[in-house]
């Protein structure tokens, strides 16, 4: 799946939860630690245990890119007031198709573990989350998704 196909199937929309402060609307860039999920390997990776705060990255799919940042945002200057990045920091509060969390696999550098865990840009359906997997796989990554929680009708946040 290409980014263009993804955007056509799952059009961008404003964040479900609007930025609460100017800091949450501040668009972060490459100097702040933002990178684009284009092809493996990820430069200067930080590894963590999937499903935990350690090594958790935030990602979004926008109309023209797939930016990501380490949630702790250690390179951001001046530091964020909350101490952590929000998905809206990847968009400046603008529209995005969807977003979530990811962890890099410590043993297999081309494997990503993802969730659709975003309060601001959650995937709207199981198909949208499945299409995120297809998009990332088309870029050369192996992808393990936490999937969709049928009980809550939302992206699962726990890996099984």
What are the language-model segments listed below?
Residues 1-160:
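Eukaryotic phosphoinositide-binding membrane-targeting regions
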């Amino acid at each position: 799946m290409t980014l263009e196909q993804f955007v056509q199937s799952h059009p961008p929309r404003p964040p479900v939860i609007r930025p609460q402060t100017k800091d949450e609307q501040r668009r972060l860039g490459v100097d702040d630690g933002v990178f684009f999920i284009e092809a493996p390997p990820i430069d200067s990776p930080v590894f963590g245990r999937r499903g935990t705060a350690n090594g958790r990255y935030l990602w979004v799919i926008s109309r023209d890119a797939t930016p990501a940042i380490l949630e702790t945002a250690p390179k951001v200057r001046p530091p964020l007031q909350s101490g952590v990045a929000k998905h809206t920091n990847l968009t400046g509060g603008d529209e995005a198709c969807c977003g979530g969390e990811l962890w890099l696999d410590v043993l297999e550098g081309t494997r990503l573990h993802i969730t659709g865990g975003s309060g601001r840009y959650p995937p709207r359906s199981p198909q949208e989350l499945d299409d995120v997997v297809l998009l990332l796989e088309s870029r050369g990554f192996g992808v393990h998704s936490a999937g969709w929680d049928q009980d809550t009708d939302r992206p699962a946040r726990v890996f099984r």
